[in-house]
Amino acid sequence: MTLLALGINHKTAPVSLRERVTFSPDTIGEALDNLLQHPLVKGGVVLSTCNRTELYLSVEQQDNLYEQLIGWLCEYHQLNPRELKSSIYWHCDNEAVSHLMRVASGLDSLVLGEPQILGQVKKAFAESQHSHSLSSELERLFQKSFSVAKRIRTETEIGSNAVSVAFAACTLARQIFESLSELNILLVGAGETIELAARHLREHRVHHMMIANRTKEKAQVLADEVQAEVITLPEIDIRLAEADIVISSTASPLPIIGKGMVERALKLRRNQPMLLVDIAVPRDIEPDVEKLNNVYLYSVDDLQAIIQQNLAQRKAAAVQAECIVQQESRYFMDWLRSQSAVNSIREYRNQAEQMRAEMAAKALTAINQGADVEQAINQLTHQLMNRLIHAPTKSLQQAASNGDLERLNLLRDSLGLEHN
């Protein structure tokens, strides 16, 4: 059995190609069914995200499969093979195992060490389970990859340092305040950065969030997801005093939160400290706000400094993580190779049992028909011996006649014979 991983990702293909090779959640089951109709494909998993589309397969053999699988992808997505061939990568066995472990651990991600990919890999695995498309080898590989990703998170610092603006803003808030769960947080805007920040805060059990946006309708979708309250931009002036933390990211050409607005909020708060994180360009918060006592204002440049420092730390952690992947992929390949022996042993035992049953049935028939018992037993054991040693005898003769001493000694070892 051979394991394969093939696909395209953000490193090998532009978004204009990646978007044409994606599988939507409702088509993955159908695609797997279609893929497993190939006589050599015994199991499959389809991983499709905005940054990658990959097939993980267990196959009987890989001869001529490269062209056939690319052809299948192109036919399924109505692409010209020339468009795909220059962007596709192809990994076998140990390389395929290492690749999946790196993907699941975030080592192959656009943002090094990002945790979301593990959830996406688990979802792809679950879809394959649901479609009954998993082979035992693939099931073992994916389960092992999940444990490797967990080990890497536990033993390295790969995921402990924020490397996106949204995560850096949330990390900064957690560093300044001992606990976020009871704080009031105001998010200004409803774009991608604020969406990421809101989800990240929700994961850290923040229960009191307000989302201020120019249009309530867009903000309401996000608010429903993270259980937040929606307010309009003009309402910020009235509600700002409630906020312990403000994270702002809009496309406004002018500041939304001015020094006077913050001063009024501080007065109502009786000068309780406020953290304001402005990740908008142009800035949403007037820079003079920084001059106020009990106000901590951070700009996108401040966060970029944190991100660069954290990215360097992640890269150092990635070296350690790669060593773990190499070690675990070797362990997995040892197991996979041992499965070949297990299957061979099982097949050999079944063959021997079939011979024994046939010989025993013949002997019993002869005895029931009046044959001498001792003679029947001797004949049974003689015939059984001849049938069992027939194949090894031919192999020994062939190795000897070919002068293949290495094979001859290997056969003698396997038969428990001493070397000459």
UniProtKB/Swiss-Prot annotation:
Copy the pathway line from the protein's UniProt record. Answer: Porphyrin-containing compound metabolism; protoporphyrin-IX biosynthesis; 5-aminolevulinate from L-glutamyl-tRNA(Glu): step 1/2
Q: Name one GO biological process term.
A: protoporphyrinogen IX biosynthetic process from glutamate
Q: Does the keyword Oxidoreductase apply?
A: yes
| UniProt: NADP(+) binding residues | G189, A190, G191, E192, T193, I194
A molecular function (GO) held by this record is:
glutamyl-tRNA reductase activity
Positions that bind substrate: T49, C50, N51, R52, S109, E114, P115, Q116, Q120
Which InterPro entries is this protein grouped with?
Answer: 4pyrrol_synth_GluRdtase, 4pyrrol_synth_GluRdtase_dimer, 4pyrrol_synth_GluRdtase_N, GluRdtase_CS, GluRdtase_dimer_dom_sf, GluRdtase_N_sf, NAD(P)-bd_dom_sf, Shikm_DH/Glu-tRNA_Rdtase
Q: What is its EC number?
A: 1.2.1.70
Judged by the first EC level, this protein's enzyme class is oxidoreductase
Per its record, the protein catalyses: (S)-4-amino-5-oxopentanoate + tRNA(Glu) + NADP(+) = L-glutamyl-tRNA(Glu) + NADPH + H(+)
Question: What Gene3D superfamilies would the database entry show?
Answer: Glutamyl-tRNA reductase, N-terminal domain, NAD(P)-binding Rossmann-like Domain
Which family is this protein grouped under? Answer: Belongs to the glutamyl-tRNA reductase family.
Give any extra note attached to this record.
During catalysis, the active site Cys acts as a nucleophile attacking the alpha-carbonyl group of tRNA-bound glutamate with the formation of a thioester intermediate between enzyme and glutamate, and the concomitant release of tRNA(Glu). The thioester intermediate is finally reduced by direct hydride transfer from NADPH, to form the product GSA.
Q: What does the domain comment read?
A: Possesses an unusual extended V-shaped dimeric structure with each monomer consisting of three distinct domains arranged along a curved 'spinal' alpha-helix. The N-terminal catalytic domain specifically recognizes the glutamate moiety of the substrate. The second domain is the NADPH-binding domain, and the third C-terminal domain is responsible for dimerization.
What is this protein's function?
A: Catalyzes the NADPH-dependent reduction of glutamyl-tRNA(Glu) to glutamate 1-semialdehyde (GSA).
Assembly behavior: Homodimer.
Q: What is this protein called?
A: Glutamyl-tRNA reductase
